[in-house]
Structure formats: structure tokens, C-alpha cells
A protein has these predicted regions:
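Flexible, glycine-rich active-site loops centered on histidine and acidic residues
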Residues: 1-43
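Catalytic cores of alpha/beta
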Residues: 1-7, 81-88, 111-117, 134-140, ...
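Conserved, mostly hydrophobic/aromatic
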Residues: 6, 90, 94, 127, ...
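Short, well-ordered coil/turn segments that N-cap beta-strands
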Residues: 10-12, 65-67, 95-96, 121-125, ...
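Catalytic beta/alpha-barrel core
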Residues: 15-16, 96-105, 174-176, 197-202
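Active-site pocket-lining/capping segments in soluble small-molecule metabolic enzymes
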Residues: 19, 32-62, 72-77, 84, ...
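Active-site glycine- and acidic-residue-rich loops that bind
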Residues: 32-40, 100-113, 133-136, 203
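C-terminal/domain-terminus segments
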Residues: 192, 199-220
Length: 220
């Protein structure tokens, strides 16, 4: 479905993403296509809004869509300066809000926010929260998902929860621990006013989101 169709049916918020390399997907042999990338998408939408023309220069008789445009950033990246520079490009190209990749270490997230502030980049940032389900899930993301760094102590806690569950015949202890850890991070982000909000990537376990928010003390 095109962006125009989304706008017509009332969806007025858009997240511009370049996308991951196909090597981490279901068809690793396919060719990556980054035309346009996230910055290009933002520039295209912003130009459409300003000129009332599509990307080919044709006037839009019904008026250009005006999306609340967003983009993403990886707070854990080496060298982090590349992400700061890319973030600046995205904001200057029209991004009004930013969603981060999953974060698991609030101290490193704070350092990233300090760098954003020092660079003079003004935008609304939402921290990405991924509730972990198992130690294997955390290890897989560390090895295969760019910009993700789950600390070893979290992995060890999940492994210990699995061992305890096996010993006592209790299912789901690692997932319960993942819910607790996600709630703890959200509560700290809220209480310390670290950023403008969070977005929870539950990855097939969306039913747990209300529980996570409740444990974090968040009322909607």
C-alpha cells in the first residue's frame, strides 16, 4: 500500500527506514536495494509538502500528504559518531521523532543522549524496548542484529531462569524475567525523564505489553 493510500485512509504518521541487509532475512541471496534510503524518503516527503509536487515534479491535484515523519537510530554503534551524523541528516531532512533500536543498558543510552544534546540536535526520542524471551534470543540478536548489544549479565539471568524452570518444572520463567527487566527499564526512563517516551517491540508477544506497562507503573 502506498504512502498516499495510507494518508487517504487516515494514517498520518510515517516511520522512514532504510531496512536491514537481506543477509539477515529469509532470502539472504537477494540483492539489497536502498533507493531511496531513509534520508531520501524524508527528503522526498518534505519536498512534496513544500512544493505540492510528487518526486517527478508533477503537481498533486489533491494536495500533498503531510505526514508526522519519523526515523530510527542505533544508540549502540561503533563508531557512534556515524549514528550522530546520520541522525542529524534525518532531522534536517524532516524527521520529527526518532525511534531507537532496542536498548538494554541505560548507562550507554544516557551517554548517547548526551552526545545528541552536545551536537545540538533537537528532536523527540523514543527508546526502543525489546522484552527478552530467552538467553538464546539475546545471543542471536547480539550476533545478527546491527545496533543491538544485550549485556552478558542479562543473558546469564535468562539462562539461570531457564535452568530454574527446568529444575522445578515451571514453564515461562525466562519470559517472565524478560517482562520484569523491560518494565524496570521503562520505569527508570520515565522516573529519570531520560527521553520523550518508549516504543515496545514485543515480537509476537504483544499480549504482554499491558503487563509490562502495569509493572512499570505507567497508566495510559
Amino acid at each position: 500500500m502506498s504512502g498516499f493510500t495510507h494518508y487517504i485512509i487516515g494514517i498520518d504518521t510515517m516511520l522512514a527506514l532504510t531496512g536491514d541487509h537481506p543477509v539477515v532475512g529469509d532470502c539472504p541471496e537477494s540483492k539489497p536495494v536502498y533507493d531511496p534510503d531513509s534520508v531520501g524518503i524524508l527528503k522526498m516527503l518534505t519536498k512534496m509538502e513544500q512544493t505540492n509536487c510528487d518526486c517527478g515534479g508533477n503537481e498533486l491535484s489533491g494536495g500533498a500528504p503531510h505526514f508526522y515523519k519519523g526515523a530510527s537510530v542505533a544508540p549502540v554503534y561503533d563508531p557512534i559518531e556515524l549514528q550522530i551524523n546520520k541522525l542529524r541528516q534525518k532531522v534536517e531532512s524532516g524527521a520529527m521523532y526518532i525511534q531507537t533500536r532496542g536498548i538494554f543498558d541505560l548507562d550507554s543510552f544516557k551517554r548517547f543522549l548526551d552526545l545528541v544534546d552536545a551536537a545540538g540536535i533537537k528532536t523527540h526520542i523514543m527508546a526502543g524496548i525489546i522484552p527478552l524471551k530467552a538467553a538464546g534470543m539475546a545471543k542471536y540478536m547480539n550476533e545478527n542484529v546491527l545496533g543491538i548489544d544485550v549485556p552478558q549479565d542479562m543473558i546469564d539471568r535468562l539462562a539461570a531462569a531457564a535452568a530454574e524452570g527446568k529444575e522445578k518444572g515451571i514453564k515461562g520463567l525466562p519470559m517472565q524475567l524478560g517482562i520484569e527487566m523491560a518494565a524496570e527499564m521503562i520505569a527508570r526512563i520515565h522516573d529519570e525523564h531520560l527521553c520523550d517516551g518508549v516504543h515496545i517491540m514485543a515480537i509476537g508477544a504483544e499480549k504482554n505489553v499491558p503487563t509490562i506497562l502495569d509493572k512499570a507503573g505507567i497508566r495510559i
